[in-house]
Amino acid sequence: VDIPQIGVDALEGILGTRATLLDVRESGDYAASRITGTQHIPLADLPDRMDEIPSDQSVYVICTKGGRSLAAVDFLLHQGLTAINVIGGTAAWIESGRPVETGEPT
């Protein structure tokens, strides 16, 4: 299966549209820094929390650098969802100077 992928430049233009940005990192990483508006489901929890992911819109999946998100996208595609991997992950987002939220999510 070819995994659809997108870079952080293109992702910025999609944020705020009818799309879901799913962060699959562990809770500690997510609390340390995250893109505003992300939905958080750790990769290991994904199979048990599928009902939390909208099936009627594209799901952009992000992690720290792109490894876990690649596995998550592969899983979501096999579940029949439209899923896209974010190349470079949160690290690329931060390196490009874009803003993040920090601290425990409210």
Description of each model-found segment:
Residues 1-20, 26-58, 67-106:
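Rhodanese-like catalytic fold shared by cysteine-dependent sulfurtransferases
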Residues 61-62:
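Short, surface-exposed ligand- or partner-binding patches at beta-edge/loop junctions that are enriched
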